[in-house]
């Protein structure tokens, strides 16, 4: 795995890093965006827009539409605050929003746990293979399905 320095955030540190990243890109950190980010970060597995809309609705005591959440999630993905797990049509908060790396997800088929790893040599190999096939893949997404260590023990 390629070595690189980046700060992993969680809790308030993650929320602060996300807010700072978004505002540095000229976007506003609104109450709704903060609520969506809080809900997204609270999930320990990838969450769909519907899951997030339900969590925000409960927290705010009013219905929040999933299409509003989708728009915010698209903004978050573009700003590197969230990653989309393509095969699950779900999202995870990016624990290091100031670092740009390709998405490599390890997804447990049994419990749904999803781990994001960085391996620049692996994603670089995918990019090179794509290029040799005449295909451009500037930011490949790699999803590996299998069984996590906890489920493997069971």
Region locations from a protein language model:
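Short alpha-helical segments that sit at the start of domains
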Residues: 4-37
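Short amphipathic alpha-helical elements of helix-turn-helix/winged-helix folds
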Residues: 21, 38-43, 55
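Short capping segments at the starts of secondary-structure elements
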Residues: 29-31, 43-48
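DNA-recognition alpha helix
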Residues: 48-62
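Basic amphipathic alpha-helical segments that dock to polyanions
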Residues: 69-79
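Non-DNA-binding regulatory cores of transcription-related proteins
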Residues: 77-154
């Amino acid at each position: 795995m390629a070595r690189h320095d980046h700060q992993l955030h969680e809790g308030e540190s993650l929320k602060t890093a996300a807010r700072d990243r978004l505002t540095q890109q000229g976007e506003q950190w609104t109450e709704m965006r903060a609520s969506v980010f809080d809900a997204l970060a609270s999930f320990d597995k990838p969450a769909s827009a519907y899951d997030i809309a339900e969590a925000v609705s409960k927290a705010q005591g009013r219905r929040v539409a999933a299409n509003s959440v989708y728009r915010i999630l698209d903004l978050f993905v573009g700003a590197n605050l969230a990653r989309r797990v393509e095969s699950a049509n779900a999202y995870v908060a990016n624990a290091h929003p100031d670092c740009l790396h390709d998405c490599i997800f390890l997804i447990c088929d049994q419990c749904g746990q999803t781990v994001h790893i960085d391996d620049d040599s692996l994603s670089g190999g995918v990019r090179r293979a794509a290029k040799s096939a005449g295909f451009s893949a500037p930011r490949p997404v790699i999803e590996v399905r299998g069984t996590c260590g906890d489920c493997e023990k069971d």
